[in-house]
A protein has these predicted regions:
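N-terminal pre-Walker A segment at the start of P-loop NTPase domains
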Residues: 1-2
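Walker A/P-loop phosphate-binding motif and the immediately C-terminal alpha-helix
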Residues: 5-55
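Residue-level preference for the first positions of well-ordered beta-strands
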Residues: 11, 40, 112, 161-164
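Short acidic, S/G/P-rich loop/turn micro-motifs used as interaction or catalytic elements
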Residues: 20-21, 121-123, 170-172
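Conserved catalytic-core segment of NTP-binding enzymes
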Residues: 37, 144-182
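Generic beta-strand/beta-sheet core signal
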Residues: 44-47, 115-117, 165-168
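P-loop/Walker-type NTP enzyme "switch/lid" segment
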Residues: 48-155
Length: 182
C-alpha cells in the first residue's frame, strides 16, 4: 500500500513502540488543548486490542455506563460487513460520543468527538474477543480499507478541525496502515 488516503482534515497519529509511556494520555491532552482553542476534534481509538480512550472520558462521569456502551470502530467493521457495505444501513451516530461540557473543553466553542475502539461496558465486554476476531480491516481487494472508509464518512458527518488517532503499541497491522495512509 503506497498511496496516501487523503482527508480534508489534518490527522495526527500517536504511536509508541513501547507500552506504558502515556500515548493515550498525550492523545487526550492534545485533544483537550485543541478543543479549548475552540476546535472540533475527533479522537479515534485504533488500539483495538487494548482500548482505553472511552474509559478516560467515562471516568467520574454521571453517564459512564452509557458512554462505555457506545459502539466503536470494531463494531463498525462488523456492522458494515453484515450490512454488505451499504452505508444506507449504517448510522454513524452509533459509533461516537460527544463531549462539549465547558468544564472540560473551555468556553471557546470547542468539541470532542470520541470514537471508541469497541463498546466496553459490562454487557458488551463479554463479546469483545469474539467481535475482535471477526473484525476485518480490509474490505475486498485493492484500496478498500476500513479506516479509509470510516474516517472519510466520519469527517463528512462531523466536520472536525483535527483528527487524532491513538494507535496500538508495537509493530502491528493497524499501526502500520495508519502511519502509511495518513
Amino acid at each position: 500500500i503506497n498511496e496516501k488516503y487523503e482527508l480534508n482534515t489534518p490527522v495526527t497519529s500517536f504511536y509508541s513502540f513501547k507500552g506504558g509511556v502515556g500515548r493515550t494520555t498525550a492523545t487526550v491532552l492534545s485533544a483537550l488543548l485543541l478543543a479549548r482553542q475552540g476546535k472540533k476534534v475527533m479522537i479515534v481509538d485504533f488500539d483495538l486490542e487494548a482500548p482505553g480512550l472511552a474509559s478516560i472520558f467515562a471516568n467520574r462521569s454521571d453517564n459512564a455506563e452509557e458512554l462505555l456502551s457506545v459502539n466503536g470502530f470494531v463494531d463498525f467493521l462488523i456492522d458494515f460487513e453484515f450490512n454488505k457495505r451499504d452505508f444506507n444501513k449504517i448510522n454513524l451516530d452509533d459509533y461516537y460520543f460527544r463531549k462539549n461540557e465547558q468544564a472540560l473543553v473551555g468556553s471557546n466553542g470547542g468539541e470532542l468527538f470520541i470514537v471508541p475502539a469497541i463498546a466496553t461496558n459490562s454487557e458488551n465486554s463479554i463479546n469483545y474477543i469474539n467481535k475482535l476476531s471477526k473484525a476485518n480491516i480490509r474490505f475486498g481487494l485493492g484500496k478498500d480499507y476500513a479506516p479509509d472508509i470510516f474516517l472519510k464518512k466520519m469527517e463528512e458527518k462531523l466536520k472536525p478541525d483535527h483528527i487524532l488517532i491513538d494507535t496500538r503499541t508495537g509493530i502491528n497491522d493497524v499501526g502500520g496502515l495508519v502511519f502509511n495512509r495518513y
